[in-house]
């Protein structure tokens, strides 16, 4: 009898140990991977006509052409039906026509169950196949997590109302802007109460579930600046006991780096690029931003740079709408500057319409100029030391042009160097650059001789150069 009890105890220990640690059959994500990575935001609903995991999985091997090493999945969980939103901001419950109501699928960020799969995309086996396929192709998968709020039919609403923020009448409320005391407008969600430690522990358990059972490689934390950093410190510490992970914060909050995150958004930099394209900012604002980042961030901190993402595309406009003729230059710039570049679903196929957020839509699938550009840039990011942008990034040196509309800088690491020179305006610009030698244009495969003579650039023209000889 004693032997039987001991065996049961031993098996229990082994079982629970397996729940906390998993044996990896592939090389886990590492700082070395982050140096050379391109990250891809996968909008499963809109990626294909089917809008499924299976349809996306078929294309994973093709993403290698773009240099993609990390796939960020927009939320994979089921979406609440209570207070589900329709295009235009109304609730679907306010739509009388049943057929019209059906077409509104709701916001990914109104989660009804943290441990379930949105049936719109497929099932758990389909998701496992997606992850395995990514790993087989040398890529890693992170999942978009919504820690700040849930949908209104999440089980916690009824089982643990104390886990939510409540007003003076004891009613659960949607997230409030602390600066105004008014709703953010996310009325299809219920605000979680991080003063409740039981809720925090259950959240950590749910986060562990996807790492342990599906072998995902990390998380992108939605509105991370709205959640106490101390929670992330505890959660990420626990998660990284299971396996190495990559953590992305949708925030610009330096404190989050000290609490477990590897990368944060470059929202400020992105808005500066938008303004440059509109003629409302110049190289001066770009330089100020780069210098500010150097002052605020530690050498191992880095940002995600982008010209588009799901928020920008759906709510602010397409790349062409926002950046116009500057689109190609600015796309190249986010690869050349320190950090990790992002590709959003459809960007690689010259997506030129705003994807619907609450209903089905689809991206184009014809390879054109942007695919060719991103293929070249992805290859450079993966293989050229001077493009390294993670925790041991290539250095950044600003070069003098004495023209407030022309930016020039050098990135270097070990013996590798790359030069970016760009006209950030819609007017012809002339300048002198204190650089000499023969250079190769890495995108055009042409030679260029620089000899400190006046250089002229057409509107939005740029060079991406590799030094060939003195």
Label every model-predicted segment.
Residues 72-81, 144-154, 222-228, 250-255, ...:
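Short, solvent-exposed turn/loop segments enriched in Gly/Ser/Thr/Pro and often Arg
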């Amino acid at each position: 009898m004693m032997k039987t009890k001991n065996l049961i105890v031993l098996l229990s220990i082994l079982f629970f140990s397996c729940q906390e640690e998993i044996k990896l059959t592939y090389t886990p994500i590492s700082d070395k991977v982050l140096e050379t990575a391109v990250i891809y935001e996968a909008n499963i609903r809109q990626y294909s006509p089917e809008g499924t995991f299976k349809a996306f999985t078929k294309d994973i091997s093709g993403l290698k052409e773009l240099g993609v090493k990390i796939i960020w999945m927009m939320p994979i969980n089921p979406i609440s039906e209570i207070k589900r939103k329709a295009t235009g901001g109304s609730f679907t419950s306010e739509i009388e026509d049943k057929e019209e109501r059906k077409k509104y699928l709701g916001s990914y960020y109104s989660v009804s169950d943290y441990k379930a799969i949105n049936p719109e995309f497929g099932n758990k086996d389909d998701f496992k196949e997606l992850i395995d396929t990514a790993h087989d192709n040398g890529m890693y998968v992170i999942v978009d997590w919504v820690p700040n709020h849930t949908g209104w039919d999440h089980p916690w609403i009824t089982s643990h109302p104390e886990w939510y923020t409540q007003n003076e009448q004891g009613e659960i409320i949607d997230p409030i802007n602390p600066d105004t005391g008014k709703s953010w407008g996310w009325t299809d969600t219920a605000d979680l109460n991080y003063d409740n430690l039981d809720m925090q522990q259950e959240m950590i358990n749910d986060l562990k579930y996807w790492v342990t059972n599906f072998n995902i490689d990390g998380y992108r934390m939605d509105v991370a600046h709205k959640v106490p950093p101390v929670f992330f410190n505890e959660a990420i510490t626990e998660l990284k006991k299971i396996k190495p992970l990559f953590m992305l914060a949708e925030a610009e909050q330096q404190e989050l780096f000290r609490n477990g995150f590897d990368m944060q958004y470059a929202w400020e930099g992105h808005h500066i690029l938008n303004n440059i394209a509109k003629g409302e900012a110049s190289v001066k604002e770009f330089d100020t931003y780069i210098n500010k980042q150097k002052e605020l961030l530690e050498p191992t901190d880095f940002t995600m740079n982008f010209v588009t993402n799901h928020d920008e595309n759906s709510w602010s406009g397409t790349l062409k709408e926002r950046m116009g003729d500057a689109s190609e230059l600015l796309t190249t710039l986010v690869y050349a500057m320190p950090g990790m570049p992002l590709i959003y679903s459809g960007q690689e196929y010259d997506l030129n319409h705003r994807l619907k957020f609450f209903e089905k839509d689809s991206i184009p699938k014809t390879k054109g100029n942007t695919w060719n550009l991103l293929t070249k840039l992805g290859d450079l990011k993966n293989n050229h030391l001077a493009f390294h942008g993670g925790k041991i990034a290539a250095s950044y040196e600003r070069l003098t042009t004495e023209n407030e509309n022309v930016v020039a800088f050098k990135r270097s690491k070990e013996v590798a160097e790359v030069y970016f020179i760009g006209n950030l305006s819609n007017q012809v610009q002339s300048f002198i650059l204190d650089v000499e030698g023969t250079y190769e244009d890495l995108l055009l495969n042409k030679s260029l001789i620089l000899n400190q003579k006046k250089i002229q650039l057409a509107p939005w023209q740029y060079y991406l150069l590799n030094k060939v000889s003195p």
